[in-house]
Regions:
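Flexible, membrane-associating and regulatory peripheral segments of lipid-active enzymes
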Residues: 1-148
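Surface cap/lid and interfacial helix-loop subdomains adjacent to catalytic sites
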Residues: 15, 43-56, 160, 185-221, ...
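Active-site catalytic motif of lipid deacylating hydrolases and related acyltransferases
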Residues: 105-126, 130-135, 139-221
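Structural recognition of the beta-strand scaffold that forms the well-ordered cores
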Residues: 150-152, 177-180, 225, 255-258, ...
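Catalytic metal-binding/acid-base residues of hydrolase active sites
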Residues: 156, 232, 262-263
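Gly/Ala-rich beta-loop-alpha elbow adjacent to hydrolase catalytic centers
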Residues: 226-233
């Protein structure tokens, strides 16, 4: 309404001072004013996005100090600068479970300090450099010597849910490592444009990890487990599009849990459609744990890859 009134007033002004009927000037005034309003909206929106992205560099009091444990990124021994991990990365590495914490909770002794590797989007300029940093960190911390390696694809802000990771750390008595690489600093709803980059980066990380595993004796390889939720689930699965379930074996992926995969996820739709290279006995879609428990034991034991809706 406001745009229409402004266009009419401008058309009348041009008609009076330049000549011609006002109606003849209407298409031009609509285009100019509409474009100006659109530019204003885009400018304002851009400022909002910049402010949101800037929060990635914000330092919280609780997570201001470098972690002491050499088994996490951002520590004095790490090749990844603590300040470049971003808000979510700093939270993730500092919350790593120590062997002492695990022993205290479980009432046992002998637990290890869990390994957490994280590379921020500001840690390096390119996908190749960030993946290289992650592999260097995995080797530095001894992650490939652990029994389990969790590979996560974070949400748009870089958030990698520490709760399932922490649960796994306790179950494994600390004999576990986890790794994630940030690809953006905006919420998932505003990170759709980053999906291709996130998929490329996650796929590159998985291939690099597989190359490391190839150099080790099978008995000395960690079990590789994937985890992702929401946009992280979609970008994790995006690395497998067109590869069926066979690609999981090719990359030596032992297990996976994806929570809340968006409908836009292509690979899951490919699996459900069936076809060459797809073994429908190794994956399942569930809305609750009861659905899984109600399956015959043989079916439960065959499932390695879980879609939780």
């Amino acid at each position: 309404m406001a745009e229409r009134k402004a266009a009419r007033a401008s058309a009348s002004y041009l008609g009076r001072h330049i000549g011609g009927p006002a109606v003849a000037w209407m298409p031009l005034t609509h285009a100019v004013i509409g474009g100006s309003l659109g530019l204003g909206v885009r400018t304002a929106f851009g400022r909002v996005l910049s402010k949101i992205a800037a929060s990635n560099r914000r330092t919280e009091v609780r997570y201001a100090d470098l972690p002491d444990a050499p088994t996490v990124s951002g520590s004095p021994e790490s090749g990844v600068a603590f300040g470049d991990l971003g808000l979510q990365g700093r939270r993730f590495v500092i919350e790593a479970s120590s062997g002492e914490q695990i022993d205290e909770v479980l009432g046992e002794t002998g637990a290890m300090d869990a390994i957490r590797v994280y590379v921020g989007v500001e840690s390096a300029d390119t996908v190749e450099e960030r993946v290289s940093l992650a592999i260097e960190e995995l080797n530095r911390t001894g992650a490939f010597d652990r029994s389990v390696l969790i590979v996560g694809s974070p949400a748009g802000t870089g958030y990698f849910n520490y709760i399932p990771v922490e649960a796994a750390e306790y179950l494994a008595r600390g004999d576990i490592a986890s790794v994630a690489i940030q690809y953006g600093s905006l919420p998932s709803t505003l990170s759709v444009g980053k999906i291709p980059l996130a998929i490329e980066q996650h796929g590159a990380l998985l291939r690099a990890i597989n190359s490391e595993l190839e150099q080790r004796d099978p008995a000395d390889r960690p079990r590789v487990v994937l985890y992702g939720e929401s946009l992280g689930a979609q970008t994790s699965q995006g690395a497998f599009v067109g590869g069926g379930t066979d690609i999981l074996d090719e990359l030596r992926i032992d297990r996976a849990l994806w929570a809340g995969t968006p409908f836009a996820g292509i690979w899951r739709r490919e699996l459900l459609a069936g076809g060459s290279g797809i073994d429908d006995t190794v994956f399942g879609t569930f809305a609750s744990i009861d659905e899984y428990r109600n399956l015959p034991q043989e079916d439960r034991e065959a499932i390695r890859f879980f879609f939780l809706n």
